[in-house]
Design a protein with these regions (language model features):
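Cofactor-/ligand-binding subdomain signature composed of acidic, glycine-rich
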Residues: 1-26, 151-165
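Glycine-rich phosphate-binding loops that contact phosphosugars or nucleotide phosphates
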Residues: 32-167
């Protein structure tokens, strides 16, 4: 038995995240229609770790070029793969993580488009990103929904809709 586990809250939070899948699909579909070159999962700390999970998930199943980028490292060294056609996905509870804000500005200056899951939609980061979705918690699920839609649109995940219908 798990102490202090609230099953009702857990189910509600997952269902809430699944409810934004239509918004995620709309954004990813728009990006796919415009064309893109690669996908970068940007973060620092826990968000970077979530990005690594999404990148590994995609590398296992997709030919789409993807990687996880540590915001602090990017601000120090840059990355020549980031530019026109790069799609950056990030997430932030506060919307004010200095390293992520700086990295997003630099990536956009290089030509990247940014999808941000920013919990507080009035913050600097929420205003910076090209596509903003505000929903707290379930960062990994949100990232996986983005990854899965890109793979589905690339003809690599035909069972995507059926899988999410089961959730």
């Amino acid at each position: 038995m798990l102490l202090k586990f609230n099953e009702e809250w857990a189910r509600s939070s997952v269902n809430g995240a699944l409810a934004i899948r239509k918004d995620i699909n709309r954004i990813v579909d728009e990006i796919c229609a415009q064309g893109y070159r690669n996908i970068c999962w940007l973060g620092i700390g826990g968000t970077w770790a979530s990005g690594m999970q999404a990148a590994v998930h995609m590398k296992e199943q997709s030919e789409i070029e993807t990687w996880a980028e540590n915001a602090s490292e990017y601000n120090t060294t840059g990355n020549k793969r980031v530019g026109e056609g790069t799609v950056v996905i990030t997430s932030s509870v506060t919307g004010s993580t200095v390293e992520v804000v700086e990295a997003v500005k630099r990536m956009q200056a290089a030509g990247a488009k940014v999808i941000g899951f920013i919990d507080i939609d009035t913050t600097e980061l929420a205003k910076l990103v090209d596509y903003e979705i505000a929903y707290p918690v379930n960062e990994q699920l949100k990232f996986f929904m983005v990854a899965d839609r890109f793979m589905q649109n690339n003809g690599e995940f035909s069972d995507c809709d059926a899988m999410y219908a089961e959730f």
